[in-house]
């Protein structure tokens, strides 16, 4: 009898250790995910037993708070939509407050800030990382009095680095997906710094995690902004891969938040662009949303985009999303209409306008003295009587001129045409239409306009990544 009892005792641990069913395992996994998520982003105290009690009012309230903040149906339950959102990639900063700012509204007490890129991800060329960070800084610079300059050594206000797992700040990264990056609010030392998880696949486009978008979001934190519950805002905590990076601009929610800390940008000390006469009405005027619309020339000017067509141009800026429509002669009475090409050299604060075998230089509203000049003074051969398009690469200080199926490259530093040109457009810009009407550089891409289409060209991958309608820049 004792022998039988001993067998029964031996069996008890075995019988109580049957594996959980698939559904039970999944439920436990979901609870673990939710517990970690709410602890990390919604200030839930670490208490496993409490979380396992289904009727815990605190847990229900935390889930409801998360659902409300992220725009989900507020059920207080770990439903499918809630769990799906918990698995999405996002910023590693908690969602514990309103969009406006961190508790106590920390802000920088100065308007000129320094930044330093401490190290680089192996996923991208160094110049691509530099460009993404510069563009992200410009997003906030354009709507505030803030300015930024780069340091290459020493301690900057904003130290930017790539790291994996535990990296010395008590906020470990978690591998690919989930937490993409985190940043600290304004202040000394670690404060203001940005850390990117280098286990992510960082890209210039939407094929992986877009570095520009994440950097712009994290910079919002470095400047004092917290997360926004507005799903259209850059400061919304979940990563949103904009399919059309060319169309990116801050939401009004983002602008309101950052300007509540620093105010709007100061009025320009330069002459504002003011038209001298209004646009006449008439059927000959181009319609911005005409599906067949093409452009004569495109240029940037002091942070704005100018799209020229016939006697007119559209003017688009980040701070005024609705394009303005003007006569060319209303701003520059001495310039011709029906232009061939235009481009800006940022370092000289000058836009160059081309028509036929002549070109003009403008700064703001002023056409510069000594113009027009002949295009052959730039180094073109006598056989070239006009150019079709031009664009200046501000990082490389090179200007590209396109004529028929060839292009030339001009060095802005030496002010001379480079040797080895012209070259065939098809050889160096594969996939682009040979007849180029205009070219624009933005967001790390070149946009080649040909008729009613534009070709988004990635210069690092040397390939066309998107084909869009030319007037998509005008919100059509």
UniProtKB/Swiss-Prot annotation:
Catalysed reaction per UniProt? Similar to stromelysin 1, but action on collagen types III, IV and V is weak
Q: Where is this motif: Cysteine switch?
A: 89-96
* Free-text cofactor note: Binds 2 Zn(2+) ions per subunit.
> Where on this chain does Zn(2+) bind?
91
Instruction: Extract one GO molecular function annotation from the record.
Output: zinc ion binding
List positions binding Zn(2+) 2: 217, 221, 227
Q: What Gene Ontology cellular-component terms does the record carry?
A: extracellular matrix; extracellular region; extracellular space
Q: Which residues bind Zn(2+) 1?
A: 167, 169, 182, 195
Compartments in which it is found: Secreted, Extracellular space, Extracellular matrix
Asked if Oxidoreductase is a keyword of the record, the answer is no
Which residue ranges make up the pro-region?
Answer: 18-98
Disulphide linkage map:
289-476
E.C. designation(s): 3.4.24.22
Q: Which residues form the active site?
A: 218
One GO BP annotation here? collagen catabolic process
Cofactor names:
Zn(2+); Ca(2+)
- In the UniProt record, the signal sequence range is 1-17
The protein's UniProt keywords, in alphabetical order, are: Calcium, Collagen degradation, Disulfide bond, Extracellular matrix, Hydrolase, Metal-binding, Metalloprotease, Protease, Repeat, Secreted, Signal, Zinc, Zymogen
Q: Does the keyword Zinc apply?
A: yes
Swiss-Prot/TrEMBL Hemopexin repeat ranges = 286-335, 336-382, 384-432, 433-476
Similarity field: Belongs to the peptidase M10A family.
Please provide the record's free-text comment about the domains of this protein: The conserved cysteine present in the cysteine-switch motif binds the catalytic zinc ion, thus inhibiting the enzyme. The dissociation of the cysteine from the zinc ion upon the activation-peptide release activates the enzyme.
Q: What does this protein do?
A: Can degrade fibronectin, gelatins of type I, III, IV, and V; weakly collagens III, IV, and V. Activates procollagenase.
Q: What is this protein called?
A: Stromelysin-2
State the gene name recorded for this protein: MMP10
């Amino acid at each position: 009898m004792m022998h039988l009892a001993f067998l029964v005792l031996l069996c008890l641990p075995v019988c109580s250790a049957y594996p959980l069913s698939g559904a039970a395992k999944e439920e436990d996994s979901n609870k673990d995910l939710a517990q970690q998520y709410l602890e990390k982003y919604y200030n839930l105290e670490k208490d496993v037993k409490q979380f396992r009690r289904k009727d815990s009012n605190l847990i229900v309230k935390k889930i409801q708070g998360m659902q409300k903040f992220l725009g989900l149906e507020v059920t207080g339950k770990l439903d499918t939509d809630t769990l799906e959102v918990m698995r999405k990639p996002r910023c590693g900063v908690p969602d514990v407050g309103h969009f406006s700012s961190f508790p106590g509204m920390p802000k920088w007490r100065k308007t000129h800030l320094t930044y330093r890129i401490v190290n680089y991800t192996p996923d991208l060329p160094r110049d691509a990382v530099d460009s993404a960070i510069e563009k992200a800084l410009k997003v906030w610079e354009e709507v505030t009095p803030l300015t930024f300059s780069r340091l290459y050594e020493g301690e900057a206000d904003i130290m930017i680095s790539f790291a994996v797992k535990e990296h010395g700040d008590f906020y470990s990264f978690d591998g690919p997906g989930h937490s993409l990056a985190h940043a600290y609010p304004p202040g000394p030392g670690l404060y203001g710094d940005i850390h990117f998880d280098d286990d992510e696949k960082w890209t210039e486009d939407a094929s992986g995690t877009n570095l520009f978008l994440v950097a712009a979001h994290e910079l919002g934190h470095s400047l004092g902004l917290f997360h926004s519950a507005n799903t259209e805002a850059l400061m919304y905590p979940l990563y949103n891969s904009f399919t059309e990076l060319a169309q990116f601009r801050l939401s009004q929610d983002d602008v309101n938040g950052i300007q509540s800390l620093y105010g709007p940008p100061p009025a320009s000390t330069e002459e504002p662009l003011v038209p001298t006469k209004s646009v006449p009405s008439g059927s000959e005027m181009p319609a911005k949303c005409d599906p067949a619309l093409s452009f004569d020339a495109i240029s940037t000017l002091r942070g704005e985009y100018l799209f020229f067509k016939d006697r007119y141009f559209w003017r688009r800026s980040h701070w005024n999303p609705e394009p303005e429509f003007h006569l060319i002669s209303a701003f520059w009475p001495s310039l011709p209409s029906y232009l061939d090409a235009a481009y800006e050299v940022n370092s000289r604060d000058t836009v160059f306008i081309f028509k036929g075998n002549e070109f003009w230089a403008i700064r703001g509203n002023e056409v510069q003295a000594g113009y027009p000049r002949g295009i052959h003074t730039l180094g073109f051969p006598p056989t070239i009587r006009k150019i079709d398009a031009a664009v200046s690469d501000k990082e490389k200080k090179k200007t590209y001129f396109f004529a028929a199926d060839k292009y030339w490259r001009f060095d802005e530093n030496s002010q001379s045409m480079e040797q080895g040109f012209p070259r065939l457009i098809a050889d160096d810009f594969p996939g682009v239409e040979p007849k180029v009407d205009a070219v624009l550089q933005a967001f790390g891409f070149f946009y080649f306009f040909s008729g009613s289409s534009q070709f988004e060209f990635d210069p690092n991958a040397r390939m066309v990544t998107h084909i869009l309608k030319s007037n998509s820049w005008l919100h059509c």
